[in-house]
Amino acid sequence: MRTNPTTSNPEVSIREKKNLGRIAQIIGPVLDVAFPPGKMPNIYNALVVKGRDTLGQEINVTCEVQQLLGNNRVRAVAMSATEGLKRGMDVVDMGNPLSVPVGGATLGRIFNVLGEPVDNLGPVDTRTTSPIHKSAPAFIELDTKLSIFETGIKVVDLLAPYRRGGKIGLFGGAGVGKTVLIMELINNIAKAHGGVSVFGGVGERTREGNDLYMEMKESGVINEQNLAESKVALVYGQMNEPPGARMRVGLTALTMAEYFRDVNEQDVLLFIDNIFRFVQAGSEVSALLGRMPSAVGYQPTLSTEMGTLQERITSTKKGSITSIQAVYVPADDLTDPAPATTFAHLDATTVLSRGLAAKGIYPAVDPLDSTSTMLQPRIVGEEHYETAQQVKQTLQRYKELQDIIAILGLDELSEEDRLTVARARKIERFLSQPFFVAEVFTGSPGKYVGLAETIRGFNLILSGEFDSLPEQAFYLVGNIDEATAKATNLEMESKLKK
């Protein structure tokens, strides 16, 4: 990535560095700005347009330089709406890239892409700011320790465990529960690990952003009485905002997370919902800048843009950033260039299945499609590894038998296969779990299940200890003891009906 000479020398007065230009052309969110000869801004510099529109309303639009065109002109992308701008308006070169507030004062607050608070709680009490464009940490600074990050979600911890300081992708089409799973992870991690999180809402629904904020206040993740005790900072650049804002909001969130890692030396969680919208915004900006599109209409710089963001999300010897990224899969096609490029950067993938969601099994995590580089005996231990492999083998055999069952029925299967199917159906249901953040919808209190409990439960099902219990006893419960209690209740209810 290019570095800006102006950012490395804070002693130079920014006032001296400010150059004045004029708007020469406006095409939607893209501005061409003419500067005096020899006063051209650098790539990624922030430009600010101030003035009044025809109705006398104040205008304050920040842009980012993307191209130097020649003839003393630059092309910049606006971070907010360009309504009211006119040719000839003055444009100030700030001499630096966009800088956003960082540190403890950001916790409990909502920011836009420019680092401005948008929660009506007044200014942010910090003088510390950081530019959103930086190089990734040097190779020698990186930390390579391998350890599991327990989430309290059975299907994740058992079959596709997350790496502390790793990158995890949540893959799924529209409406299969990506955002609910992210909200549950924020809730569990804040309560169980006491970690600090940064949430980047990239191009998603404003309503979901508002719901998330309200639920965080209710659950105590954001402490309204004492914001300093909050566990999360929120950065939103939602669907209705210009592509420039959606393209850069991920970097704003990442910059805040980097400060907690590098200066406060903390372990941080960075949530990005949705990384596909980052690619989509980049595609829009690329088209507006006149670049030739690549495969499926995406920008030719897709891999570079993704790599620039992802390589900064890493663990150093000071602290770690564990990143969980929702990845919208267009038309459920995993070979689309956007999800395919994202795959290359991930340590674990949690794939959400429409088939499981249709069955009512939530979280709708596909146990066979989800993967993790952490599921190795030397990392997770022999017992965990063996249990996970047996669960996968049982579910795989059930999947193979489904066609035979659909055509001939269960009675045509061998005794051994019928037992496999019965256990697989119990496992499938036991992989479901009531969520804390979904209590209002399900009416069931949320459950956090430790890894040891999860392994014990699945071992008991695989050993045949619960072959006599009905499969509905395993649906939406926490640990295995709750399943046995539910089976007893179901038996009593059926006796009463008789």
From Swiss-Prot:
Reactions listed under catalytic activity: ATP + H2O + 4 H(+)(in) = ADP + phosphate + 5 H(+)(out)
Coiled coil: none
EC id: 7.1.2.2
Main location (coarse class): plastid
Localization (cell): Plastid, Chloroplast thylakoid membrane
Highest taxon above the source species: Eukaryota
Membrane topology according to the record: Peripheral membrane protein
Keyword Plastid belongs to the record: yes
Role: Produces ATP from ADP in the presence of a proton gradient across the membrane. The catalytic sites are hosted primarily by the beta subunits.
Subunit annotation: F-type ATPases have 2 components, CF(1) - the catalytic core - and CF(0) - the membrane proton channel. CF(1) has five subunits: alpha(3), beta(3), gamma(1), delta(1), epsilon(1). CF(0) has four main subunits: a(1), b(1), b'(1) and c(9-12). Interacts with RBCX1.
Protein name as annotated: ATP synthase subunit beta, chloroplastic
The organism of origin for this protein: Arabidopsis thaliana (Mouse-ear cress)
Record lineage: Eukaryota, Viridiplantae, Streptophyta, Embryophyta, Tracheophyta
